[in-house]
A protein has these predicted regions:
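N-terminal Rossmann-like NAD(P)+-binding domain of SDR-like oxidoreductases, especially those catalyzing
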Residues: 1-142, 177-183, 187
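Heptad-repeat alpha-helical coiled-coil signaling segments
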Residues: 169-171
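Extended hydrophobic secondary-structure segments that form protein cores and membrane-embedded regions
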Residues: 88-92, 206-211
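Aromatic/pi-system hotspot detector in well-structured domains
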Residues: 59, 105, 149, 210-211
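Short C-terminal boundary/hinge segments that cap the last helix of small helical domains
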Residues: 25, 161-162
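Alpha-helical substrate-binding/gating segment
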Residues: 134, 149-161, 173-210
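Short, hydrophobic secondary-structure boundary micro-motifs
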Residues: 61, 83, 162-165, 194-197
Length: 211
C-alpha cells in the first residue's frame, strides 16, 4: 500500500522521495543542505506503546536520536547565511498525559508521569524542541495527536481488523484525514494552544462498526 501510494506521488514534479534513516545524521544533513526547507514537518517515528515494551532500542533510535537529528538540522539551517527553517511541526502523542483520568485533556495538565517508554520519549521530544526554540529561535509546533483510525488498508486487503484489550479500552479517536488537514493548517502558522481531542472517549469496536 505504501509503495503504491509512493508511485502515485511520483507523478508530481515538486515531489521528491529520499529513503533513509532518521537516526542517520549524515542523511538528514544532506537533505537539509540540498532542499533548504523553510517548513519542516516531522511525522517520522516508531509508533505504539505496546511495541516499545518489547523493542525499546527501536524507539530510542527512531524517536529520540532521529528527532535530535531533525532539531540539529533546523538549528544549522542558519549557518553560512542560508535560508533558515521558519517553522518546525512535529507529532507528539496523547500518551504523554500518562494515567491522567481528567477529560478532556488540557495543555495545562501536568505531563511528568509517563507510564511507557514511548510516552517518556515523546515528552523528551517536547522538552528538547522547547529548549531549541528558546536557544536558537526555531518556531516549533507540537501536535499531541490522539489515536488515529482509518481501516481502509485492511478492508481493501480483506484482512481482519485487530482490536486490543478485548475492545474494553476507551480513547479519543481521530480520523486520519482530519489529522492530515490539521497538519496542513498548522504549517501555515502556529495556532493557539489546543489539543486534538474532544473529550468523548469511545471503545474501538464502536469505530469499527462505522465501517
Amino acid at each position: 500500500m505504501k509503495e503504491a501510494r509512493l508511485n502515485e506521488l511520483k507523478q508530481f514534479e515538486n515531489f521528491s522521495f529520499v529513503k533513509g534513516n532518521l537516526a542517520d545524521k549524515a542523511v538528514i544533513e544532506s537533505i537539509f543542505e540540498q532542499y533548504k526547507p523553510e517548513i519542516v514537518v516531522n511525522l517520522g517515528a516508531q509508533a505504539g506503546v505496546r511495541y516499545s515494551i518489547t523493542n525499546p532500542a527501536t524507539y530510542v533510535e527512531a524517536n529520540l536520536i532521529g528527532f535530535y537529528n531533525i532539531l540539529e538540522a533546523c538549528r544549522h539551517s542558519y549557518d553560512e547565511g542560508r535560508t533558515p527553517v521558519e517553522h518546525l511541526v512535529y507529532a507528539s502523542s496523547s500518551s504523554v498525559y500518562g494515567s491522567n483520568k481528567k477529560v478532556p485533556y488540557s495543555t495545562d495538565d501536568k505531563v511528568d508521569n509517563p507510564v511507557s517508554l514511548y510516552a517518556a520519549i515523546k515528552k523528551s521530544n517536547e522538552l528538547t524542541s522547547h529548549a531549541y526554540s528558546k536557544l536558537y529561535n526555531i518556531l516549533s509546533t507540537v501536535l499531541p495527536d490522539m489515536a488515529y483510525f482509518g481501516f481502509m488498508n485492511k478492508l481493501v486487503r480483506g484482512e481482519t481488523i485487530q482490536i486490543f484489550n478485548y475492545g474494553n479500552c476507551k480513547c479519543d479517536f481521530t480520523y486520519v484525514d482530519d489529522i492530515v488537514e490539521g497538519v496542513v493548517r498548522v504549517m501555515q502558522g502556529a495556532p493557539e494552544r489546543k489539543n486534538g481531542e474532544d473529550g468523548l472517549p469511545v471503545p474501538p469496536c464502536e469505530i469499527v462498526k462505522c465501517y
